[in-house]
Amino acid sequence: MAKAKYYGTGRRKSSIARVYLVPGTGKVTINKRDMDAYFGLETLKLIARQPLVLTETADKFDVLVNVHGGGFTGQAGAIRHGISRALLQADADYRPALKKAGFLTRDPRMKERKKYGLKAARRAPQFSKR
């Protein structure tokens, strides 16, 4: 019989992460690269691992991630969201803890669009009195 495979989609800013949890030793692979090779900053690794640490499943699942779009911070947030959703498929008892920590909520904050007449979303051209 095939091993159990749990799936979750995570989104943050313009990043989308497809996350698969497979029973294993706790290895995290992002876009066919090790997490340490993919994320340079330690804080990004911590953000991505938060749901596994919270539910104490860091050494019970191997995490396979395919992520695209956005920057590293958005991708780390998308991975966290995806892992949280996949953990719910694995065991629904994790829901209260994940919900309380805010890992199941899709962060709706997006980049504000640039407006005409302005240099950026809100940045106006320099004002000259004379």
Curated annotation (Swiss-Prot):
Keywords noted in UniProt: Ribonucleoprotein, Ribosomal protein
Segments of skewed composition (Basic residues): 111-130
InterPro entries: Ribosomal_Su5_D2-typ_SF (IPR020568), Ribosomal_uS9 (IPR000754), Ribosomal_uS9_bac/plastid (IPR023035), Ribosomal_uS9_CS (IPR020574), Ribsml_uS5_D2-typ_fold_subgr (IPR014721)
PROSITE patterns membership: RIBOSOMAL_S9
Any single GO BP term: translation
GO CC, alphabetical: cytosolic small ribosomal subunit
Disordered: annotated span: 109-130
NCBIfam families: PRK00132.1 (NF001099)
Family: Belongs to the universal ribosomal protein uS9 family.
Listed name of the protein: Small ribosomal subunit protein uS9
Source species of the chain: Lachnoclostridium phytofermentans (strain ATCC 700394 / DSM 18823 / ISDg)
